[in-house]
Amino acid sequence: EQLIRKDVXHXEXFAXXS
């Protein structure tokens, strides 16, 4: 579960940052 949460956070950060 924690791994998935990290993936989601990364994705959000990427979109934002991008």
Swiss-Prot record:
<protein>
    <recommendedName>
        <fullName>Scolopendra 5920.47 Da toxin</fullName>
    </recommendedName>
</protein>
<comment type="similarity">
    <text>Belongs to the scolopendra toxin 3 family.</text>
</comment>
<keyword id="KW-0964">Secreted</keyword>
<dbReference type="GO" id="GO:0090729">
    <property type="term" value="F:toxin activity"/>
</dbReference>
<keyword id="KW-0528">Neurotoxin</keyword>
<dbReference type="GO" id="GO:0005576">
    <property type="term" value="C:extracellular region"/>
</dbReference>
<keyword id="KW-0800">Toxin</keyword>
